[in-house]
Amino acid sequence: FEGFTVHLLLRYTSGHKDFPDAEMNIKHTLENTARKIPHKEAIILGNRRITYGELDEVSNKVANALLKMGMQKGTHVAILMSHSPEWVINYFGVIKGGGIAVLLNTALKAPELEALLRDSDSEILITERGFSQILSPFISNIPLLKHVITVDTASYTKMIANSSSVSPDIDIKDEDEATIFYTSGVLGKQKGVVHTHASSMGTPPVVSAGIQRKREDVIIDLVPFSYLFGLFEVLFGSIIQGSTVVLIPSFTPRAFLEAVDKEKGTISFGVPAMYNALAMVRDEILERYDLSSLRLVVTAGAKSFPKLMQILEDKFNLSLYEVYGLTEVSAVSISTADSRKLGTVGKPICRLKILDDNGKATAIGEIGEAVFNAPWVMKGYYKAPDLTAQVLKDGWFYTGDLVKMDEEGYLEYIEKKSFIIVTSSGLNIGPSEVEFLLLSHPSVAEVAYVGINDGYGGQIPTAFVVLKDGQHATAEELSNLCYQNLADFKLPKRIEFIDSIPKTSSGKISRKKLKEIDLSQH
């Protein structure tokens, strides 16, 4: 698989004189691009447009202001901000000053934010006035927090105006810690994932090579930068190449279509739920927009439904590429122009083992746990060596994800082990198979198949279904569809019609919230 990665980079970079030298340092990556193309637009939000030169200069001002405030190399600086140019500016300000950025999800509630600010040992918080109400009850009680900087205030504007625009003379090494992401993906509890400068810069050039991102590309970004996929593959990958990134703070199909039309977007990054929504947009609405510039969309973060993705490709006349990865190990498998197969996540770009429950390698076509070895794996979980040891063993990262590989080397993501439904008889059901089947019904828009605890150690397989506008289907009709196509033990015991499937802030199905629904009220 290392050969496939090298092939991608060599094939793409040869003959492309604009491809910058590979950097393993976040600070130097921005500075190199800003030096080469200072007047090229870097970030766009609505009518706000920031060039690479401006991004470099203003982030220097932020860095120097933070250093004057008392930030030192290694200081933890939390960022709680909306998806905006200011987020990018302040993130790079922290990095250039030698700080470690702690990225907080804007969808978190007060108890969650308080817990993460405490756990992360953050000494500075950069935020916006819109978060003051949620922060005010507890912010003065965070023991190590010394400063709260609110960016949309006159005092912040004055602080930046009076700060030097010269890059701080801070010795930042590739192996220095750079960013802490909080995730609950693998072990089911919130924990800080620590990435260094080097681990941050491993996959962006590989993914850029795979999707053939060029300097003239305009990236439509639907993914917040507080997520690794957004920061590494969207922002860092675009900065390395010198592409322009158009931000959409809150996804709606209309916002996406308007951005592509106005900015002549060429590549989009999002999650499957967003592209599912776009696939459902009526043709007469699409005809109002010029979407001819859009050549491909990239998805990650959840399992996509091949049928809907094929509809999307046909409707928009583009290609869909999938990226599979985790916060702890970044991208590990991608689709490319040379290796694309709907229903798969392309081919691995690092070393992979697929292991059965006994730790033995599976045969081709057999399902097992994905275990990866990559140079861009996380440094570890913050202050949690025991948790790190559970998933990182002898350089191999144990994902908890079930996958299988076909005879051509394409990797198919099945689902997380934790999503498996265990019946009262002890049989295991993979939700995606049932979800795919129910989605094939012409009246069904969305499906989530989860196990509701039965009180006896097993689970009640329950399908939550959202119907398309104006369409009708009965539980009996959908049950018959399952009966005709699935083994009896896989059949839903209940089918519940709901108005919408609850999602996480990253657009994934919130199976936890579905399991909390009181079925006695339905």
Q: Where is each model-derived feature located?
A:
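Conserved AMP-binding/adenylate-forming core of the ANL superfamily
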Residues: 18-26, 31, 39-84, 88-92, ...
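Conserved pre-ATP/AMP-binding loop-to-beta segment of ANL
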Residues: 23, 39, 150, 164-182, ...
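ANL superfamily adenylate-forming
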Residues: 47, 130-174, 281-282
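Conserved AMP-binding A3 loop
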Residues: 51-53, 178-202
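AMP-binding/adenylate-forming catalytic core of the ANL superfamily
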Residues: 108, 125, 268, 374, ...
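Conserved AMP-binding/adenylation subdomain of ANL enzymes
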Residues: 201-218, 226-267, 277, 281
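Gly/Ser/Thr-rich phosphate-binding loop
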Residues: 262-270, 279-342, 351, 359
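AMP-binding/adenylate-forming core of the ANL superfamily
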Residues: 353, 364-378, 396, 402-403
